[in-house]
């Protein structure tokens, strides 16, 4: 990579808090933000709109190449995502979209198709990259790497609370099973399995508030910046 802009990677399983933490840290640093999960979800949405068969890897790879995805960075408040020019932000956060994105992400050719698109986010003054393989595959040379984790029960509880606050009725045990199944898929896939980079700082977010986690991450950057 010719662009030496600093990169902070924040990886971890679904529900560990990496999205919220990454957005806040990026906003406070004034850096760009990459939500790699949103990129895979965007491809999932496009595939759903086109009624593609998830068992047809060739069609999904074409979809990954052809889908136009635009991120509207909105600071700490969140991220607006346009898929082929259409605002798909709300659809990206559906549980069904997450499951589809996880299945699509397991296809090596899709991951390869999206690799350079993700690396293109590395621009001055810096980038906070949130995902599952940011520190191991996409930005292995990143100066700052963090891996957030939490128990499956903790993560299911957070998701249950989020959905209930939005008026969505869900069963906790169903969410827990979905999270455990996704953990297994992410950890067992052949290409870029979910695991911490060897030089990543591990932070267990169980029982810790978001602001405390943000402070730890920002403190890491401060301690390693000359």
Curated annotation (Swiss-Prot):
One GO term (biological process): pyrimidine nucleotide metabolic process
Keywords for the protein's UniProt record, in alphabetical order: ATP-binding, Cytoplasm, Kinase, Nucleotide-binding, Transferase
Cross-referenced InterPro entries: Cytidylate_kin (IPR003136), Cytidylate_kinase_dom (IPR011994), P-loop_NTPase (IPR027417)
Recorded GO MF terms: (d)CMP kinase activity; ATP binding; CMP kinase activity; dCMP kinase activity
Predominant localisation class: cytoplasm
EC class name: transferase
Assigned EC number: 2.7.4.25
Compartments in which it is found: Cytoplasm
Residues that coordinate or bind ATP: 12-20
GO CC annotation, single: cytosol
Reaction(s) catalysed (UniProt annotation): CMP + ATP = CDP + ADP; dCMP + ATP = dCDP + ADP
Database matches in Pfam families: Cytidylate_kin
Protein family (similarity comment): Belongs to the cytidylate kinase family. Type 1 subfamily.
Protein name: Cytidylate kinase
Species this protein is from: Xanthomonas campestris pv. campestris (strain ATCC 33913 / DSM 3586 / NCPPB 528 / LMG 568 / P 25)
Taxonomy of the source species: Bacteria, Pseudomonadati, Pseudomonadota, Gammaproteobacteria, Lysobacterales
């Amino acid at each position: 990579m010719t662009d030496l802009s600093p990169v902070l990677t924040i990886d971890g399983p679904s529900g560990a808090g990496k999205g919220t933490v990454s957005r806040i840290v990026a906003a406070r640093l004034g850096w760009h933000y990459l939500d790699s999960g949103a990129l895979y979800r965007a491809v999932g949405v496009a595939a759903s709109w086109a009624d593609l068969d998830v068992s047809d890897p060739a069609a999904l790879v074409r979809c990954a190449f052809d889908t136009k995805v635009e991120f509207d960075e909105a600071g700490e408040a969140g991220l607006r995502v346009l898929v082929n020019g259409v605002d798909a932000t709300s659809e990206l956060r559906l549980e069904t979209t997450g499951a589809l994105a996880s299945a699509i992400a397991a296809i090596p050719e899709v991951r390869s198709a999206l690799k350079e698109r993700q690396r293109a986010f590395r621009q001055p003054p810096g980038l906070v990259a949130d995902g599952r393989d940011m520190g191991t595959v996409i930005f292995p040379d990143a100066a700052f790497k963090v891996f957030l984790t939490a128990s499956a029960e903790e993560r299911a509880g957070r998701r249950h609370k989020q959905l209930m606050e939005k008026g969505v009725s869900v069963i906790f045990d169903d969410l827990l099973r979905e999270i455990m199944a996704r953990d297994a898929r992410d950890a067992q896939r052949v290409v870029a399995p979910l695991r911490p980079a060897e030089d990543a700082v591990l932070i267990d977010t169980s029982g810790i508030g978001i602001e405390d986690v943000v402070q730890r991450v920002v403190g890491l950057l401060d301690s390693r910046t000359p």
